[in-house]
Amino acid sequence: MAEDFVSVSHLTKRFGDLTVLSDISFSVRKGEFLCVVGPTGCGKTTFLSCLTGAYGVDSGSILLDGEKVDLKKRNIAYIMQEYSTLPWLTVRQNVAFGLTIKKRPRKEAREKVEEVMEKVGLTAFADMYPRQLSASMLQRVSIARAFAVEPELLLMDEPYGQLDIDLRFKLEDELLRLWKASGTTVIFITHNIEEAVYLSQRILILTNKPTSIKDEIPVNLPHPRDVAAADFVALRNRVTEEIRWW
């Protein structure tokens, strides 16, 4: 069994008198794909912001590979629902942006960018600008940029929430291929229960505020998954019922 890579212990986060996250403890194994679901407004994004260190915590600890999270030392990528491409850069330049910041050797960076663009179907669009791309292509750019830096940890905050179902499934399948090939640890926030069951190896279910972990459900289904299969539907219904009734 893989060792724990992310360890969260008794995490509590408040904004003034409002307790958003309350005594949250969980761990994520190295290379695991974890989905986190919960009702709208329960603090899922705050949860990720604490993991990155963007928000301090009022109590508890967050460890990455046994150490406090230090973004200068660790290789963490973050993909949001809002498109985060840089409009003045081409697709190729956007994908290369993280590698440029990290000062990777030019030849190595160029080869990595071309490799990742090929995997997500961006090669033909490499010299275009974000304004020329569709919504799904913009998210492909964000995904390619994230995987280009070969992150230890990839945090995803409802990245496909604005896409229609056909585009979402295509991007989910691309994400799974990249995850399997890279071995990256993924924490994926979503309000879409079917998406969580389709992607993850394990699901954390959050409560309403003050948010805590209500349940942890393993997803022991092989990929590729059939959303109409009886075992898939049963698991989706189980998660739905847990979120519906508090």
Question: Where would I find each of the regions flagged by the language model?
Answer:
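A short, proline-enriched helix->beta-strand linker immediately N-terminal to the Walker B motif
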Residues: 148-152
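Helix-to-loop junction immediately C-terminal to a conserved catalytic motif
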Residues: 52
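Conserved ABC ATPase signature
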Residues: 129-133, 137
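Conserved ABC ATPase "signature" region
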Residues: 107-125, 177
